[in-house]
Regions:
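Surface-exposed extracellular loop regions of Gram-negative outer-membrane beta-barrel proteins
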Residues: 119, 125-128, 228, 233, ...
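Conserved C-terminal beta-signal and adjacent last beta-strands/turns
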Residues: 87, 100-102, 425-530
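Transmembrane beta-strands of outer-membrane beta-barrel pores
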Residues: 49-53, 67-69, 78-82, 115-119, ...
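Repeated loop/turn-to-beta-strand initiation elements of outer-membrane beta-barrel proteins
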Residues: 69-73, 105-111, 119, 155-159, ...
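Structural signature of Gram-negative outer-membrane beta-barrels, strongest in the C-terminal barrel
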Residues: 203-218, 242-356, 361-362, 397-400, ...
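Gram-negative outer-membrane beta-barrel transporters
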Residues: 260-266, 357-370, 381-461
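Flexible loop and strand-edge segments within Gram-negative outer membrane beta-barrel domains
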Residues: 86, 94, 108-195, 232, ...
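Outer-membrane beta-barrel translocator/receptor signature
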Residues: 8-95, 106-107
């Protein structure tokens, strides 16, 4: 839906980047902060860089331009770090080419090509940071081609079409697997996935009624091979070779409406149908959606939603289907073929011009398929149930013209309904974040953020042969000092993560987007636009 413009396409924003370059990253501005208020023909150059301890460095460079009805963006992104321990390194390169052509206000075409290659060690997130493989290595390569079009035959109608093709390969080897009890064991594997997805959507806006309807089709073929060598003390005299081929097809259709009712109420209704054919699970499901947004007074918004979803492959985490219902997220990184029911309620409150606060709580019940192997070599697919409760409360305040304060509390509890489930761990986490930013007239911006985490859970202990309870409670402080260059050229900042070098045991929910740094780390960053 975006009109033709001069905003650069950042290669890094299309990827789930490694944690070392994103944790505590609230100071770094996005490139669109330097965009002009009015669109003019011409070229733009945007760049950013980072350098720090543990061999950390990276850069992002983008050239973009606008000439009448044609716009383009060329970008590259590079990052590397040695991490906080042995074999915790990451090296990644991303290249992006984007073009958009709009011969008239009613019609627009766009195309994008992305290439990503990465090499990593054992960067898996475990509650015990001392448990890792010193020999695990992984190399990945992904090519993505995306095309899209928008046609608006009338002011109340929009028609969208999108197509994505992706080719993904990975190779991994581990000469000392963490989860293998046999000395001298080794594992080597390779995999490739070729997939494409096509989607179409129609959007209609009739004053008090907005309607969205669409459909999509995905086809994916994956080939995997693995060699298991249990070593001289293993149960088998030689290596075991495993070859697997899997094909997935997914067809979905959906319709959503947003209806404005009297009393400042907006009602959201929806229905999606999903047909999923795969080796692990076949599904045919209808998923109802319902949401309500009510503004009983100026500055007050009350939200509620209930809906069911079916997890499917999303190439590059992209889809035309609406991802939220009344502000509640629908799609997560669940295993393909999972089903979930989520319901929740929330409130957002604005007080004057200096305070924004709110809270929400929701429940999400999941059914997750998992393939399990039997001693005779056969395998079966079992369905495991997990109940998750999440809560959030926040307050953003600007008590003074140059002072901004933030407070946020987050809660999450995952409760598997079966014992010794292989797909989820009993886990309860409380997280509190307190932050302050001061904007001085000379261009300096000191910032500080304090994060408190209290986590308890049941984790599998290989030496004990079962699950044991573990937890930790700790504080982490991050600080930064930024400087805004004259004439809005850019910013420069120095950032110190985990100021007091706090040691802790914490299980990340998303290992590639860590909320806290494992150790003290000093970084310098810059962003510039010309």
């Amino acid at each position: 839906l975006q009109p033709i413009n001069t905003l650069p396409v950042q290669p890094s924003l299309g990827e789930r980047r490694p944690a070392y370059l994103t944790a505590a990253d609230s100071l770094t501005p996005a490139f669109n902060e330097y965009a002009e208020l009015f669109v003019n023909d011409g070229l733009g150059l945007y760049g950013s860089g980072i350098v720090g301890e543990n061999g950390t460095m990276g850069d992002e460079l983008i050239v973009n331009g606008l000439y009448g009805t044609f716009a383009f963006s060329l970008g590259q992104y590079y990052e590397q770090t040695d991490g906080f321990r042995e074999n915790d390194d990451i090296e990644q390169r991303i290249y992006d080419v984007f073009a958009q052509y709009s011969p008239s206000p009613a019609f627009s075409l766009q195309a994008e090509y992305r290439f990503n290659e990465a090499e990593t060690g054992d960067i898996g997130a475990r509650i015990d940071h001392a448990v890792y493989s010193p020999t695990y290595r992984q190399e990945t390569e992904r090519e993505t081609v995306r095309v899209g079009a928008r046609y608006s035959p009338a002011s109340v109608w929009d028609v969208l079409v999108s197509g994505i093709y992706q080719d993904y390969t990975e190779d991994a080897i581990d000469e000392s697997p963490v989860e293998n009890p046999f000395p001298g064991a080794a594992v080597e594997g390779a995999g490739s996935t070729e997939a494409y997805i096509g989607e179409g959507q129609v959007i209609a806006q009739f004053g008090w009624l907005d309607a969205i309807a669409g459909a999509g089709y995905l086809n994916s073929e994956r080939n995997d091979s693995a060699v298991f060598d249990f070593g001289p003390f293993g149960p088998f005299p030689g290596p075991i070779v495993s070859v697997d081929e899997d094909r997935e097809e997914h067809l979905n259709a959906y319709a959503y409406t947003h209806i404005d009712l009297p009393g400042a109420i907006q009602l959201t209704t929806g229905l999606s149908g999903n047909r999923h054919d795969a080796e692990i699970r076949d599904l045919n499901r209808l998923n109802p959606k319902a949401g309500l947004t009510w503004q009983p007074a100026a500055g007050t918004t009350i939200r509620a939603a209930a809906f069911r979803t079916t997890s499917r492959i999303l190439l590059s985490d992209l889809t035309l289907e609406p991802t939220h219902v009344a502000g509640f997220q629908q799609f997560y990184d669940d295993p393909v073929g999972s089903e979930a029911v989520r319901y929740g309620i929330g409130i957002d409150q604005r007080v004057g011009h200096c305070l924004m606060a709110g809270a929400e709580i929701s429940r999400r019940d999941r059914e997750i398929p998992a393939e399990q192997s039997a001693p005779d070599g056969s395998s079966t697919v079992n369905i495991f149930e997990v109940e998750s409760t999440t809560g959030r409360a926040y307050a953003y305040c600007t008590p003074l013209r140059r002072l901004a304060l933030t407070t946020e509390y987050a809660y999450r509890q995952d409760e598997p309904q079966q014992e010794n489930t292989p797909i989820a761990t009993q886990l309860e986490t409380h997280r509190v974040e307190l932050g302050a930013s001061l904007f001085l007239p000379v261009g300096l911006t000191p910032r500080i953020r304090t994060t408190y985490i209290d986590q308890d859970g049941e984790f599998f202990d290989m030496m004990a042969g079962g699950f044991t309870g573990r937890g930790d409670e700790f504080w982490v402080v991050d600080a930064a000092l930024g400087y805004h260059l004259p004439r809005r050229i850019g910013t420069f900042s120095i950032e110190l993560r985990n100021v007091f070098d706090e040691e802790f045991n914490y299980q990340e929910y998303d290992p590639l987007n860590s909320v806290v740094s494992e150790g003290r780390m000093l970084l310098a960053k810059f962003t510039a636009a010309f």
